[in-house]
């Protein structure tokens, strides 16, 4: 694996796609109290808590993991 894969240092940053995480907050009112439910949907291909980035064919690496700023 190329050293560029660690930082996903692609020449064209538009080739890197950040897999996002969506959050849904539901507030349900009951007779006695308020309950909050948070549902976090994470992409099925994501295997850790960090974001994932895939560099295109024009980059020096493919399938690199990173959190682009």
UniProtKB/Swiss-Prot annotation:
Keywords, ordered alphabetically: Metal-binding, Metal-thiolate cluster
UniProt-listed GO biological process terms: cellular detoxification; intracellular copper ion homeostasis
Disulphide bridges, residue numbers: none
Tissue: Expressed in leaf mesophyll cells, root tips, and at low levels in anthers.
GO MF terms held by the record: copper ion binding; zinc ion binding
Function summary: Metallothioneins have a high content of cysteine residues that bind various heavy metals. Functions as a metal chelator of copper (Cu) and zinc (Zn). Plays a role in Cu homeostasis, specifically in the remobilization of Cu from senescing leaves. The mobilization of Cu from internal sources is important for seed development.
Family, similarity comment: Belongs to the metallothionein superfamily. Type 15 family.
This protein's name: Metallothionein-like protein 3
Species for this entry: Arabidopsis thaliana (Mouse-ear cress)
